[in-house]
Protein backbone atom coordinates (compact mmCIF):
# COMPACT_ATOMS: atom_id res chain seq x y z
CA UNK A 1 0.00 0.00 0.00
CA UNK A 2 2.83 2.39 0.91
CA UNK A 3 4.62 1.48 -2.32
CA UNK A 4 1.54 2.30 -4.40
CA UNK A 5 1.10 5.63 -2.62
CA UNK A 6 4.77 6.50 -3.19
CA UNK A 7 4.49 5.60 -6.88
CA UNK A 8 1.40 7.79 -7.20
CA UNK A 9 3.20 10.73 -5.56
CA UNK A 10 6.27 10.35 -7.79
CA UNK A 11 4.07 10.01 -10.89
CA UNK A 12 2.19 13.20 -9.99
CA UNK A 13 5.47 15.06 -9.44
CA UNK A 14 6.80 13.81 -12.79
CA UNK A 15 3.64 14.99 -14.58
CA UNK A 16 3.90 18.42 -12.96
CA UNK A 17 7.55 18.72 -13.99
CA UNK A 18 6.69 17.66 -17.55
CA UNK A 19 3.95 20.29 -17.74
CA UNK A 20 6.39 23.01 -16.69
CA UNK A 21 9.05 21.73 -19.10
CA UNK A 22 6.54 21.63 -21.97
CA UNK A 23 5.44 25.19 -21.20
CA UNK A 24 9.05 26.35 -21.09
CA UNK A 25 9.68 24.59 -24.39
CA UNK A 26 6.89 26.59 -26.06
CA UNK A 27 8.59 29.80 -24.86
CA UNK A 28 11.99 28.65 -26.14
CA UNK A 29 10.48 27.73 -29.49
CA UNK A 30 8.80 31.10 -29.91
CA UNK A 31 11.98 32.94 -28.97
CA UNK A 32 14.06 30.88 -31.41
CA UNK A 33 11.49 31.35 -34.18
CA UNK A 34 11.54 35.07 -33.50
CA UNK A 35 15.34 35.10 -33.80
CA UNK A 36 15.26 33.14 -37.07
CA UNK A 37 12.55 35.43 -38.49
CA UNK A 38 14.36 38.59 -37.26
CA UNK A 39 11.74 39.66 -34.73
CA UNK A 40 11.56 39.73 -30.95
CA UNK A 41 9.11 36.98 -30.09
CA UNK A 42 7.36 37.04 -26.68
CA UNK A 43 8.96 39.77 -24.54
CA UNK A 44 6.23 41.32 -22.40
CA UNK A 45 5.09 38.86 -19.71
CA UNK A 46 7.89 38.27 -17.24
CA UNK A 47 11.65 38.59 -17.88
CA UNK A 48 12.37 38.05 -21.59
CA UNK A 49 8.72 36.99 -21.96
CA UNK A 50 9.37 33.79 -20.00
CA UNK A 51 5.95 33.80 -18.35
CA UNK A 52 4.13 34.03 -21.68
CA UNK A 53 3.34 30.32 -21.52
CA UNK A 54 1.69 30.85 -18.12
CA UNK A 55 -0.50 33.60 -19.59
CA UNK A 56 -1.37 31.36 -22.55
CA UNK A 57 -2.30 28.54 -20.17
CA UNK A 58 -4.64 30.82 -18.21
CA UNK A 59 -6.19 32.03 -21.46
CA UNK A 60 -6.83 28.48 -22.68
CA UNK A 61 -8.31 27.40 -19.34
CA UNK A 62 -10.74 30.33 -19.30
CA UNK A 63 -11.98 29.92 -22.87
CA UNK A 64 -15.30 28.23 -23.58
CA UNK A 65 -14.98 24.58 -24.53
CA UNK A 66 -18.13 23.54 -26.36
CA UNK A 67 -18.53 20.80 -28.99
CA UNK A 68 -19.74 22.09 -32.37
CA UNK A 69 -23.27 21.27 -33.62
CA UNK A 70 -23.54 17.71 -34.90
CA UNK A 71 -20.42 16.50 -33.10
CA UNK A 72 -20.24 13.28 -31.10
CA UNK A 73 -19.90 14.84 -27.65
CA UNK A 74 -18.40 11.83 -25.87
CA UNK A 75 -15.78 11.12 -28.55
CA UNK A 76 -15.09 14.84 -28.94
CA UNK A 77 -14.25 15.17 -25.25
CA UNK A 78 -12.29 11.90 -25.00
CA UNK A 79 -10.10 12.48 -28.08
CA UNK A 80 -7.67 15.01 -26.51
CA UNK A 81 -7.21 12.72 -23.50
CA UNK A 82 -6.51 9.75 -25.78
CA UNK A 83 -3.90 11.84 -27.63
CA UNK A 84 -2.10 13.21 -24.54
CA UNK A 85 -2.25 10.29 -22.09
CA UNK A 86 0.01 7.84 -24.03
CA UNK A 87 2.73 10.49 -24.28
CA UNK A 88 2.64 11.06 -20.52
CA UNK A 89 2.71 7.29 -19.99
CA UNK A 90 5.74 7.01 -22.27
CA UNK A 91 7.81 9.17 -19.94
CA UNK A 92 7.20 6.60 -17.21
CA UNK A 93 9.83 4.27 -18.69
CA UNK A 94 12.39 6.90 -19.73
CA UNK A 95 15.58 6.62 -17.69
CA UNK A 96 16.68 10.15 -16.75
CA UNK A 97 19.70 8.74 -14.92
CA UNK A 98 21.11 5.48 -13.65
CA UNK A 99 18.20 4.05 -11.68
CA UNK A 100 16.09 7.20 -12.22
CA UNK A 101 13.12 5.73 -14.07
CA UNK A 102 9.58 5.46 -12.82
CA UNK A 103 9.32 1.94 -14.29
CA UNK A 104 12.41 0.09 -15.53
CA UNK A 105 10.82 -2.60 -17.70
CA UNK A 106 12.64 -5.12 -19.87
CA UNK A 107 10.71 -4.16 -23.02
CA UNK A 108 10.96 -0.39 -22.69
CA UNK A 109 11.60 0.15 -26.41
CA UNK A 110 8.46 -1.77 -27.38
CA UNK A 111 6.41 0.06 -24.75
CA UNK A 112 7.51 3.46 -26.03
CA UNK A 113 6.80 2.52 -29.64
CA UNK A 114 3.33 1.40 -28.60
CA UNK A 115 2.64 4.62 -26.70
CA UNK A 116 3.83 6.77 -29.60
CA UNK A 117 1.60 4.82 -31.98
CA UNK A 118 -1.47 5.25 -29.76
CA UNK A 119 -1.47 9.03 -30.06
CA UNK A 120 -2.81 8.86 -33.60
CA UNK A 121 -6.02 7.27 -32.31
CA UNK A 122 -6.79 10.45 -30.40
CA UNK A 123 -6.23 12.50 -33.54
CA UNK A 124 -8.45 10.29 -35.69
CA UNK A 125 -11.12 10.10 -32.98
CA UNK A 126 -11.20 13.87 -32.65
CA UNK A 127 -11.37 14.29 -36.41
CA UNK A 128 -14.29 11.89 -36.77
CA UNK A 129 -16.14 13.38 -33.79
CA UNK A 130 -15.82 17.02 -34.89
CA UNK A 131 -18.33 16.76 -37.75
CA UNK A 132 -16.12 18.85 -40.03
CA UNK A 133 -14.72 18.05 -43.45
CA UNK A 134 -11.45 19.82 -42.65
CA UNK A 135 -11.04 17.82 -39.45
CA UNK A 136 -11.90 14.60 -41.28
CA UNK A 137 -9.25 15.23 -43.93
CA UNK A 138 -6.72 15.97 -41.21
CA UNK A 139 -7.57 12.72 -39.43
CA UNK A 140 -7.20 10.70 -42.62
CA UNK A 141 -3.84 12.30 -43.27
CA UNK A 142 -2.71 11.51 -39.72
CA UNK A 143 -3.68 7.86 -40.08
CA UNK A 144 -1.94 7.43 -43.44
CA UNK A 145 1.13 9.32 -42.23
CA UNK A 146 1.43 7.17 -39.12
CA UNK A 147 1.14 3.97 -41.17
CA UNK A 148 4.06 5.04 -43.32
CA UNK A 149 6.36 6.48 -40.70
CA UNK A 150 5.64 4.03 -37.88
CA UNK A 151 7.01 1.25 -40.11
CA UNK A 152 10.53 2.63 -40.49
CA UNK A 153 10.44 4.19 -37.03
CA UNK A 154 10.50 0.69 -35.56
CA UNK A 155 12.99 -0.62 -38.10
CA UNK A 156 15.41 2.23 -37.37
CA UNK A 157 15.59 1.08 -33.73
CA UNK A 158 16.20 -2.60 -34.38
CA UNK A 159 19.86 -2.01 -35.22
CA UNK A 160 20.38 -0.54 -31.75
CA UNK A 161 18.53 -3.46 -30.18
CA UNK A 162 20.76 -5.90 -32.08
CA UNK A 163 23.97 -4.23 -30.92
CA UNK A 164 22.85 -3.83 -27.30
CA UNK A 165 21.18 -7.25 -27.15
CA UNK A 166 18.31 -5.89 -25.07
CA UNK A 167 15.00 -4.02 -25.30
CA UNK A 168 15.59 -2.38 -21.92
CA UNK A 169 16.36 1.33 -22.16
CA UNK A 170 18.69 1.13 -19.16
CA UNK A 171 20.67 -1.75 -20.68
CA UNK A 172 20.91 0.10 -23.99
CA UNK A 173 22.44 3.11 -22.22
CA UNK A 174 24.89 0.88 -20.34
CA UNK A 175 25.93 -0.66 -23.67
CA UNK A 176 27.05 2.83 -24.81
CA UNK A 177 29.72 3.32 -22.13
CA UNK A 178 32.52 2.89 -24.68
CA UNK A 179 30.91 4.41 -27.78
CA UNK A 180 27.58 6.10 -28.46
CA UNK A 181 25.41 4.22 -30.91
CA UNK A 182 25.01 7.29 -33.13
CA UNK A 183 28.56 6.52 -34.33
CA UNK A 184 27.64 2.90 -35.06
CA UNK A 185 24.14 3.63 -36.39
CA UNK A 186 24.25 7.04 -38.14
CA UNK A 187 21.59 6.07 -40.69
CA UNK A 188 19.40 4.58 -37.99
CA UNK A 189 19.68 7.76 -35.90
CA UNK A 190 18.82 9.99 -38.87
CA UNK A 191 15.84 7.84 -39.87
CA UNK A 192 14.59 7.73 -36.29
CA UNK A 193 14.70 11.51 -35.94
CA UNK A 194 12.84 11.96 -39.23
CA UNK A 195 10.17 9.46 -38.23
CA UNK A 196 9.97 10.98 -34.75
CA UNK A 197 9.24 14.44 -36.14
CA UNK A 198 6.53 12.91 -38.34
CA UNK A 199 5.05 10.97 -35.40
CA UNK A 200 4.83 14.22 -33.39
CA UNK A 201 3.11 15.98 -36.33
CA UNK A 202 5.71 18.72 -36.40
CA UNK A 203 6.79 20.82 -39.35
CA UNK A 204 7.61 19.88 -42.04
CA UNK A 205 5.42 16.82 -41.34
CA UNK A 206 2.38 18.61 -39.90
CA UNK A 207 0.10 17.76 -42.84
CA UNK A 208 -2.76 16.59 -40.53
CA UNK A 209 -3.15 20.20 -39.30
CA UNK A 210 -1.89 22.06 -42.36
CA UNK A 211 -3.17 25.63 -42.06
CA UNK A 212 -2.71 26.38 -45.75
CA UNK A 213 -5.35 23.98 -47.02
CA UNK A 214 -7.17 22.49 -43.98
CA UNK A 215 -7.67 25.60 -41.76
CA UNK A 216 -6.29 23.68 -38.74
CA UNK A 217 -6.99 20.09 -39.73
CA UNK A 218 -8.22 17.89 -36.90
CA UNK A 219 -7.94 20.89 -34.52
CA UNK A 220 -10.36 23.06 -36.50
CA UNK A 221 -13.32 22.63 -34.12
CA UNK A 222 -11.36 22.48 -30.86
CA UNK A 223 -11.07 25.35 -28.38
CA UNK A 224 -10.31 25.83 -24.71
CA UNK A 225 -8.94 23.00 -22.61
CA UNK A 226 -9.58 20.38 -25.31
CA UNK A 227 -7.34 22.28 -27.71
CA UNK A 228 -4.85 22.74 -24.87
CA UNK A 229 -4.59 18.98 -24.33
CA UNK A 230 -3.86 18.39 -28.02
CA UNK A 231 -1.30 21.21 -27.89
CA UNK A 232 0.29 19.77 -24.75
CA UNK A 233 0.41 16.28 -26.27
CA UNK A 234 2.22 17.59 -29.35
CA UNK A 235 4.95 19.38 -27.41
CA UNK A 236 5.38 16.50 -24.98
CA UNK A 237 5.66 14.16 -27.98
CA UNK A 238 8.58 16.25 -29.27
CA UNK A 239 10.30 15.96 -25.89
CA UNK A 240 9.57 12.22 -25.76
CA UNK A 241 11.09 11.69 -29.20
CA UNK A 242 14.14 13.73 -28.15
CA UNK A 243 14.44 11.71 -24.92
CA UNK A 244 14.22 8.44 -26.82
CA UNK A 245 16.80 9.61 -29.37
CA UNK A 246 19.18 10.56 -26.56
CA UNK A 247 18.64 7.23 -24.82
CA UNK A 248 19.11 5.06 -27.89
CA UNK A 249 21.79 6.91 -29.86
CA UNK A 250 23.51 9.55 -27.72
CA UNK A 251 24.43 7.69 -24.56
CA UNK A 252 21.46 8.61 -22.38
CA UNK A 253 22.71 10.08 -19.10
CA UNK A 254 26.35 9.21 -19.93
CA UNK A 255 28.55 12.17 -20.73
CA UNK A 256 31.64 12.13 -22.96
CA UNK A 257 34.47 10.08 -21.48
CA UNK A 258 36.61 13.15 -20.76
CA UNK A 259 33.73 15.16 -19.23
CA UNK A 260 31.28 12.55 -17.94
CA UNK A 261 32.38 12.45 -14.26
CA UNK A 262 32.07 16.23 -13.83
CA UNK A 263 28.29 16.47 -14.22
CA UNK A 264 25.50 14.27 -12.80
CA UNK A 265 23.73 11.93 -15.21
CA UNK A 266 20.36 13.76 -15.20
CA UNK A 267 22.13 17.02 -16.14
CA UNK A 268 23.78 15.35 -19.13
CA UNK A 269 20.45 13.84 -20.12
CA UNK A 270 18.68 17.20 -19.93
CA UNK A 271 21.39 18.97 -21.93
CA UNK A 272 21.25 16.37 -24.70
CA UNK A 273 17.45 16.47 -24.86
CA UNK A 274 17.62 20.27 -25.05
CA UNK A 275 20.02 20.14 -28.00
CA UNK A 276 17.85 17.64 -29.90
CA UNK A 277 14.73 19.72 -29.18
CA UNK A 278 16.50 22.84 -30.50
CA UNK A 279 17.33 20.95 -33.68
CA UNK A 280 13.64 20.12 -34.08
CA UNK A 281 12.81 23.83 -33.66
CA UNK A 282 15.44 24.72 -36.25
CA UNK A 283 13.88 22.21 -38.65
CA UNK A 284 10.47 23.81 -38.14
CA UNK A 285 11.88 27.29 -38.75
CA UNK A 286 13.80 26.52 -41.93
CA UNK A 287 12.26 23.65 -43.90
CA UNK A 288 9.15 24.02 -46.09
CA UNK A 289 6.11 21.79 -45.81
CA UNK A 290 6.03 19.16 -48.62
CA UNK A 291 2.95 18.05 -50.50
CA UNK A 292 1.11 15.13 -48.96
CA UNK A 293 1.94 12.76 -51.82
CA UNK A 294 5.63 13.67 -51.51
CA UNK A 295 5.49 12.92 -47.79
CA UNK A 296 3.98 9.47 -48.25
CA UNK A 297 6.25 8.67 -51.20
CA UNK A 298 9.32 9.51 -49.14
CA UNK A 299 8.17 7.22 -46.33
CA UNK A 300 7.46 4.15 -48.46
CA UNK A 301 9.93 4.49 -51.35
CA UNK A 302 13.00 6.03 -49.69
CA UNK A 303 12.96 5.82 -45.89
CA UNK A 304 11.59 2.28 -45.56
CA UNK A 305 14.10 0.68 -47.98
CA UNK A 306 16.94 2.56 -46.27
CA UNK A 307 15.77 1.31 -42.86
CA UNK A 308 15.63 -2.27 -44.16
CA UNK A 309 19.10 -1.96 -45.71
CA UNK A 310 20.49 -0.55 -42.46
CA UNK A 311 18.89 -3.39 -40.51
CA UNK A 312 20.31 -6.02 -42.89
CA UNK A 313 23.80 -4.53 -42.77
CA UNK A 314 23.72 -4.29 -38.97
CA UNK A 315 22.56 -7.89 -38.70
CA UNK A 316 25.38 -9.11 -40.93
CA UNK A 317 27.98 -7.20 -38.90
CA UNK A 318 26.61 -8.46 -35.57
CA UNK A 319 26.59 -12.07 -36.80
CA UNK A 320 30.11 -11.74 -38.24
CA UNK A 321 31.47 -10.31 -34.98
CA UNK A 322 29.84 -13.03 -32.88
CA UNK A 323 31.07 -15.87 -35.10
CA UNK A 324 33.93 -17.96 -33.59
Curated annotation (Swiss-Prot):
Keywords: Cell inner membrane, Cell membrane, Membrane, NAD, Quinone, Translocase, Transmembrane, Transmembrane helix, Ubiquinone
Alphabetical list of Pfam families matching this protein: NADHdh
A GO biological-process term: aerobic respiration
GO cellular component terms, semicolon-separated: plasma membrane
Enzyme nomenclature, EC number: 7.1.1.-
Organism domain of life: Bacteria
Its membrane topology: Multi-pass membrane protein
Record field: catalytic activity: a quinone + NADH + 5 H(+)(in) = a quinol + NAD(+) + 4 H(+)(out)
HAMAP family xrefs: NDH1_NuoH
Annotated function: NDH-1 shuttles electrons from NADH, via FMN and iron-sulfur (Fe-S) centers, to quinones in the respiratory chain. The immediate electron acceptor for the enzyme in this species is believed to be ubiquinone. Couples the redox reaction to proton translocation (for every two electrons transferred, four hydrogen ions are translocated across the cytoplasmic membrane), and thus conserves the redox energy in a proton gradient. This subunit may bind ubiquinone.
Protein known as: NADH-quinone oxidoreductase subunit H 2
Amino acid sequence: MIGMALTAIISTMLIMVLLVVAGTFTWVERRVLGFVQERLGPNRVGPFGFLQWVADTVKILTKEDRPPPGADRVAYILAPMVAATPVLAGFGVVAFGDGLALANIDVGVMFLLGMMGLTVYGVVLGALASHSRFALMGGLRAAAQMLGYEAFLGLSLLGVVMIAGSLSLTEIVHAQRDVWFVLLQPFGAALFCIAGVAAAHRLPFDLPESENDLVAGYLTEYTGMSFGLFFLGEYLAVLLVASLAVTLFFGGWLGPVWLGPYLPGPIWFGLKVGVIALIFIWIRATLPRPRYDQLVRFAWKIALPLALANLLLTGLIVVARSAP
